[in-house]
Amino acid sequence: MNSFNNTFPMISGPSFARKAVLATALSLTLGAPAFAQTTATTTATFEVTAINEISLSGTAPVLTINAAVAGVAPTPTTASQTYAVTTNETAKISAALDAAMPDGLTLTAAMAAPTGATSLSAVALTTTGQDLVTGISKLNEAGLALTYGLAATSAAGVVGSSNRVITYTITAI
């Protein structure tokens, strides 16, 4: 061996290389500042409130009775629109007129039932809310048929053009 290896026998050879790498890694790790990890938290507050919405589409109905068969009451007439409904509760739809119909005239409304609900067919409208659809439960549907009917007795006589505001209400039950 040469004089260097004789004087410092521990710093030569493969085990020295391993120890040197380990010592270097250790000194870098211990000598380096620790990296701090920072976190933050928050609390998300959420809520879904009751949603009961109804809308109408299409032209407002115009109903004209202008024909009859001899010996029979005047021929009823119909008109239609569509409606859409969204609810996240169990609900029903009712309708009411803003004023009573003239004697001898009956205005009806029939709403197609959304999935799982029940339509009460053609219901005569009055100034008191009349149920048209019941059992509506947590859904949203559009393009549902809404059909109006106007029937008259001969005793109604001639009735000039008039109108009634129909208010549809969706109510949680």
Residue ranges with predicted function:
Residues 22-23, 168:
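General helical structural elements
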Residues 14-15, 33, 160:
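General helical secondary-structure elements
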Residues 19, 32-36:
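Sec/Tat signal peptide C-region and signal peptidase I cleavage site
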Residues 24-33:
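Hydrophobic core
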Residues 3-22:
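Bacterial N-terminal signal peptides that target proteins for export
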Residues 11-12, 30, 74, 157:
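Helix-centric, low-specificity signal for extended rod-like, repetitive segments
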Residues 37-120, 125-173:
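N-terminal small/polar-rich segments of proteins
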Residues 5, 14, 29, 82, ...:
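Serine/proline-rich low-complexity intrinsically disordered segments, especially terminal tails, linkers
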